[in-house]
Amino acid sequence: MKNIADIAKIAGVSKSTVSRYLNNGSVSLKTQQKLDEIIRENDYQPNQFAQSLRARRTNMIGAIIPRMNSFAVDETIKGVKTVCDQLNYSLLLNYTNLNIQLEIDALETFYRSKVDGIVFMATEITDQHLEVINKINVPVIIVGQAHDDLHCIIHNDYQAGYLVGDMLGQQGYNDIKFFGVTESDIAVGVQRKEGLIAGLEAHNIQPEISLTSFNYQEAMVDVVEALQAYPHYDAIVGATDSIALAIHKYNSEHKPHAHEKYIVGFGGDPVTDIVSPSIHTINYNFEYAGSVAMDKLNQMIQHQVIEQRIIIDVEQSFEN
């Protein structure tokens, strides 16, 4: 009878990859399909005792969150929690403050706590993350970032950026400032920015770009410096609603005709509609993304094959 080493040799993968597959850990869809076929053809039967040890489920789900007091995080976790309640899972949260080492620690802590699965709201995926996720043999689903070797739920950030760029071009805005974030965050720092640039280029417009932080207070410092140096933009775009709120605050306090500035953010935070004049924003379906993530994670826990990547579209909530 074939053993794990035999299956690994036939598949051309490591024994640890086969072990992750058998324990419903994180392997690519292509590898899952290959192992499905090989195991079926060879009538491989995993050690029942070993499987029974892993089958002792705790009905606990771990969620790793990057920020507190964030509309995006709150809404995503709301969606996760709704599905957890429906499926009788308890939800544990671990807050990491955008710190990679704390994220690594959280993954290992949840593994030691024997959670059935992990929802990871990532701002970037490094080799360190990948190494730990592959090692812990716990189903992990990523929300907010894409990686070819992991199961991911992502928002269509390129679409979001393009909608804003195209809308500004159609409206006749030409002198445009964009406050972006580091490209280590692929979704916001790369995809969203590239979409915006493409939307503007369709109208032969090039934005002036500065980098800032996700943190409101830190963004405020960068916004003040940039807009004091050149205050004459007719439209200003923040890569997030928090950055857009910092822009709004500066304009409200420093310019007597702040309403003449067209300010745009991303996320759909209700605060953007409360301030006056309101901030135009792209709505993200964060709660829905959270519910999809938890539903798919449950399928992984049940040893079902799921899509490698699911893209959630965004919505333009304001009129041109």
From Swiss-Prot:
Span of domain HTH lacI-type: 1-55
Top-level taxon of origin: Bacteria
Gene: scrR
CDD domains: HTH_LacI, PBP1_TreR-like
Protein name as annotated: Sucrose operon repressor
InterPro entries hit by this protein: HTH_LacI (IPR000843), Lambda_DNA-bd_dom_sf (IPR010982), Peripla_BP_I (IPR028082), SBP_2_dom (IPR025997)
SUPFAM superfamilies: lambda repressor-like DNA-binding domains, Periplasmic binding protein-like I
Keywords, in A-Z order: DNA-binding, Repressor, Transcription, Transcription regulation
Its job: Negative regulator of scrB expression.
PROSITE patterns: HTH_LACI_1, HTH_LACI_2
Transmembrane segments: none
DNA-binding region per UniProt: 4-23
Pfam families on file: LacI, Peripla_BP_4
GO MF entries: DNA-binding transcription factor activity; transcription cis-regulatory region binding
Coiled-coil segments on the chain, per record: none
Provenance organism: Staphylococcus xylosus
